[in-house]
């Protein structure tokens, strides 16, 4: 039976002290990290953010606390989320894989996809990553956990893939790893130094 991302799900994993993981202070630090990375590589203040698989949009408030004028747009596959928060938090209905064909009238300085990819099937991941690479102006924050990580929280439907699987998928999409779950848009590739990338350059002797 498919998982249902309804109010009961979000109440359990985000508000119930017996199950919720991640403190508000930790989220604020994560948001600050992603904003700083994007602004560093863009060389200017953050203008807009696309939050994919945003749930109830927990990133929105800390983003706006840091950058009050930022244009925030969320996407989620939950009917509950869009019905309840779609208008007030600017959340549209979309699955991750639909990013392959979904486009907006702008590219995004920061694209966020936090705690989503490890619940998806390979074909949907690859399709969505192609869309992220096409829409990213600056940095994509792709927080994903692997078979080498100790994972807390919702394990239903969790795919414990090797880190190398994701690195290949990100590389195939043209995304460049710069550390701490951050990946540079392909168009930034010529503007960065070799050691800013969190990988060995191709052909490097070991």
Place the predicted regions along the sequence by residue:
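Short catalytic micro-motifs in class I SAM-dependent methyltransferases
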Residues: 115-119
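Class I (Rossmann-like) S-adenosyl-L-methionine-dependent methyltransferase catalytic domain
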Residues: 1-104, 120-206
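A conserved beta-strand element that flanks and buttresses the S-adenosyl-L-methionine
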Residues: 112
């Amino acid at each position: 039976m498919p998982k249902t991302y309804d109010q009961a799900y979000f109440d359990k994993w985000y508000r119930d002290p017996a199950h919720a993981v991640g403190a508000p202070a930790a989220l604020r630090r994560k948001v600050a990290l992603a904003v700083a990375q994007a602004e560093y590589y863009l060389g200017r203040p953050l203008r807009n953010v696309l939050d994919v698989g945003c749930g109830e949009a927990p990133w929105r408030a800390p983003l706006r606390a840091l950058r009050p004028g930022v244009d925030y747009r969320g996407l989620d596959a939950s009917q509950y989320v869009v019905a309840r928060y779609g208008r007030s938090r600017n959340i549209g209905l979309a699955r991750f894989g639909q990013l392959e064909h979904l486009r907006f009238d702008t590219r995004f300085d920061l694209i966020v996809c936090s705690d989503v990819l490890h619940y998806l099937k390979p074909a949907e991941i690859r399709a969505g990553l192609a869309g992220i690479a096409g829409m990213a102006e600056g940095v994509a924050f792709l927080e994903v956990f692997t078979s080498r990580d100790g994972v807390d929280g919702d394990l239903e439907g969790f795919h414990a893939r090797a880190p190398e699987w994701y690195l290949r998928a990100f590389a195939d999409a043209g995304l460049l790893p710069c550390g701490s779950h951050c990946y540079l848009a392909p168009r930034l590739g010529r503007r960065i130094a070799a050691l800013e990338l969190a990988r060995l350059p191709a052909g490097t002797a070991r």
